[in-house]
């Protein structure tokens, strides 16, 4: 390492190099308003027994009056058999789950030893060590290609045929796209435009509308990227590159009018969908997200839509309120000097826990969190500053109320740091908090009638359905660091960028017997937890149903699992020092490297479509975004693109492309738990505040109308299979989407 490299490495540990390191963004009045909202219990009116008796008259209790039924008894409809069998059955099942957990541990140890002694030996082991030692993506790619050459994976790439995608359709489509693209280029050279119409360009648009769709012909199947360390089939890569070239050619073509291009790219955008980065909870394990974000940022594939829960919400807030240049200076080991949430001594937090039931002080966390959120920044202000769409999952303190996904559509004036605190309020760690809203004069007030919220990981760690509903997200990049989930992660046939090396990719991890035992034990534990939940036998410590921390979906289209170490569990509620944060940054980046090629191919098409859509929306005088897109900003140095901040891009796109609401065919969208999906704007606590909200938020009629639309596959069900209809009706009867084990189980094929 030369002198310049040593100096650069030293700067990453120097806190003075961090932007706004010494700046406190939050105003003291904001904290005082937050403190008042936390202590306000709500006024309860005094009610007399009647008009002439005193209020506090002494009233004798009637004898023989039946006691009011307890809530738990009323909910579970307890009877004699329930009372007699509940605890014996509960202890029996817990005993069996404990035995299964012990057997699962032994199975994983067997698989680990099998892979070390049978699979990873000799030359392949040395190449694997070189791969894991790389700290930047170009060097990692070289090491991955060397390992693929040794294992014979390069030959697999050269063979078009594969069971998990339609190679014949893709092969023919590549030939057609190339042929039509050459014809368009020839017409441009010969200037045969006539009246401005180009038959070849129109034919190319027709081809693009047919194939620019989510997972068209299976080209986005993760299995296509799970057979090699570097990349995918050569045919798939050729198809992605050709598709990108054709999209750019249509955008630059003068044989199509701007209005036609605008409509064309609107259709492509709706059909292809959007990509979102989802950051899970996991206490201080969430600091691995910094490395994942840094890897995506350095390679230009950081999505605009970001969601976070609990600890992941803090990372998401930092990313969504900073520009790319600021993030590159922030995501360094010196950032550890600003992470001071757990700096109190052991006697201090024990005494607080004894008095309040929570280990940490809410006001202190609000002060610390505000720096990551740039003070009392709202969701809309963050969107207007960076072009990124921040989403934070929050769960109401009432176990029966629906969860919310706070963003610039559902809660535009909600203060980000209050939502981050609510999403991190784990019972026993932090008490439920009140969301705060910023009024027109800049002061803060309680949001949603002062209701309190808590940790989003308890019910919706990865809000995939809400993201799809709000932003048409159908491709999710999940960074999963929950410690209780990482222990059970196992991919028997390999995962993206990490193929099974046993039998040259055709085998199973640990052999077929080891993988079969692992799957059986894991599914059996999941089954018994569901039985306990559906029979309402599980106790509710702190008034919370804790079964969802195991039974919800924790993965996405691409799931990144940073590799943790045992000491992370010891430091699960302590601040990292710069050395520990440097290791977490490095591990987070290395865990993202195998997934980058898959993500690059996806965003290569998405970015081309979105940039073209914004270009022609601006040219046609129809802006689609209240703030310039990040991708648009990077390619518009003069900042000519400055649309109105009142216009809502997603509402316009959805209202234009989705079918209009019809009088009699009204269908309300329901969430996973059978209740109504909560996509409404949070209600203000004051009438004045409500008027301010309505003036600042985007068109609420468009947002609410999306709740009452009839999905396309529900109209005209005559063409649907009778078996699909029986399955849907059965799911409605049993009220359990999870019985199919797939979020798409209720949708017809």
Swiss-Prot record:
One GO cellular component term of this record is: lipid droplet
Which biological process, per GO, is one annotated for this protein?
A: triglyceride mobilization
Keyword annotations: Hydrolase, Lipid degradation, Lipid metabolism, Membrane, Transmembrane, Transmembrane helix
Membrane topology (UniProt): Single-pass membrane protein
Tell me the SUPFAM superfamilies matching this sequence: FabD/lysophospholipase-like
Which residue ranges does UniProt annotate as crossing the membrane?
87-107
Give the domain of life.
Eukaryota
Role played: Probable lipid hydrolase.
- Name under which the protein is recorded: Patatin-like phospholipase domain-containing protein An01g04180
Organism from which the protein derives: Aspergillus niger (strain ATCC MYA-4892 / CBS 513.88 / FGSC A1513)
Lineage start: Eukaryota, Fungi, Dikarya, Ascomycota, Pezizomycotina
């Amino acid at each position: 390492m030369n002198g310049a490299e040593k100096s650069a490495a030293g700067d990453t540990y120097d806190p003075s190099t961090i932007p706004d390191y010494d700046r406190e963004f939050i105003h003291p009045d904001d904290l005082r308003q937050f403190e008042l909202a936390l202590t306000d219990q709500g006024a309860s009116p005094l009610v007399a027994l009647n008009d002439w008796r005193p209020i506090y008259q002494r009233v004798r209790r009637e004898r023989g009056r039946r006691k009011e039924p307890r809530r738990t008894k009323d909910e579970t409809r307890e009877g004699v058999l329930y009372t007699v069998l509940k605890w014996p059955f509960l202890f029996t099942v817990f005993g069996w789950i404990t035995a299964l957990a012990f057997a699962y541990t032994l199975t994983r140890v067997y698989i680990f030893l099998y892979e070390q002694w049978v699979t990873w030996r000799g030359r392949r082991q040395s190449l694997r060590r070189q791969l894991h030692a790389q700290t930047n993506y170009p060097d990692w790619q070289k090491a991955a290609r060397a390992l693929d050459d040794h294992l014979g994976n390069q030959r697999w790439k050269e063979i078009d045929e594969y069971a998990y995608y339609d190679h014949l359709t893709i092969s023919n489509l590549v030939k057609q796209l190339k042929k039509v693209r050459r014809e368009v280029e020839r017409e441009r050279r010969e200037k045969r435009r006539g009246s401005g119409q180009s038959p070849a360009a129109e034919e190319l648009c027709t081809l693009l509308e047919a194939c620019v769709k989510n997972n068209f012909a299976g080209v986005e199947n993760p299995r296509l990227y799970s057979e090699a360390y570097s990349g995918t089939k050569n045919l798939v890569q050729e198809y992605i590159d050709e598709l990108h070239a054709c999209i750019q050619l249509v955008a630059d073509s003068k044989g199509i009018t701007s209005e036609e291009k605008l409509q064309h790219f609107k259709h492509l955008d709706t059909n292809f969908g959007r990509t979102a980065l989802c950051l899970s909870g996991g206490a201080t394990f969430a600091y691995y997200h910094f490395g994942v974000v840094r890897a995506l940022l350095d390679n230009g594939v950081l999505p605009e839509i970001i969601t976070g829960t609990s600890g992941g919400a803090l990372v998401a807030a930092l990313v969504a309120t900073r520009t790319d240049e600021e993030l590159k200076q922030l995501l360094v080991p010196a950032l550890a000097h600003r992470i001071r949430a757990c700096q109190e001594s052991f006697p201090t937090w024990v005494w607080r826990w004894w008095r309040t039931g929570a280990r940490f002080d809410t006001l202190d966390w609000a002060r610390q969190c505000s720096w990551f959120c740039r003070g009392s920044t709202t969701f809309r202000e963050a969107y207007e500053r960076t072009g990124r769409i921040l989403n934070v999952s929050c769960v109401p303190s009432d176990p029966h109320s629906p969860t919310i996904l706070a963003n610039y559509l559902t809660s535009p004036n909600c203060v980000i740091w209050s939502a981050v605190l609510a999403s991190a309020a784990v019972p026993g760690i932090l008490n439920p908090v009140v969301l705060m809203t910023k009024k027109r004069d800049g002061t803060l007030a309680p949001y949603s009638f002062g209701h309190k919220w808590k940790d989003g990981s308890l019910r919706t760690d990865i809000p995939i359905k809400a993201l799809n509903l709000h932003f048409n997200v159908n491709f999710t990049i999940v960074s999963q660091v929950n410690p209780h989930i990482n222990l059970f992660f196992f991919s028997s046939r390999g995962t993206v960028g990490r193929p099974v090396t046993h039998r040259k990719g055709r085998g199973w991890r640990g052999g077929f017997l080891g993988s079969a035992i692992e799957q059986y034990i894991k599914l059996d534990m999941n089954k018994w937890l569901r039985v306990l939940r559906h029979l309402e036998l599980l106790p509710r410590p702190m008034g919370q149903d804790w079964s969802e921390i195991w039974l919800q979906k924790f993965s996405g289209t691409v799931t990144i699992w940073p590799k943790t170490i045992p000491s992370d569990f010891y430091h699960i509620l302590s601040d990292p020092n710069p050395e520990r944060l440097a290791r977490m940054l490095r591990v987070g980046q290395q865990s993202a490297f195998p997934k980058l090629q898959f993500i690059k191919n996806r965003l290569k098409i998405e970015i081309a479509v979105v940039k073209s859509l914004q270009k022609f929306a601006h040219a046609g005088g129809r802006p689609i975004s209240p703030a310039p897109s990040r991708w648009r900003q990077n390619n518009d140095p003069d900042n000519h693109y400055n649309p109105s901040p009142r216009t809502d891009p997603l509402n316009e796109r959805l209202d234009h492309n989705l079918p209009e609401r019809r009088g009699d065919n009204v269908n309300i969208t329901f969430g996973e738990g059978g209740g109504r999906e909560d996509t409404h704007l949070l209600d203000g606590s004051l009438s004045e505040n409500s008027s301010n909200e309505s003036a600042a938020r985007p068109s609420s009629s468009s947002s609410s109308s999306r709740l009452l639309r009839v999905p396309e596959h529900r109209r005209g069900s005559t063409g649907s299979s009778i078996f699909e209809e029986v399955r849907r009706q059965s799911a409605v009867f049993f009220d359990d989407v999870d019985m199919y084990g797939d979020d798409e189980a209720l949708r017809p094929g």
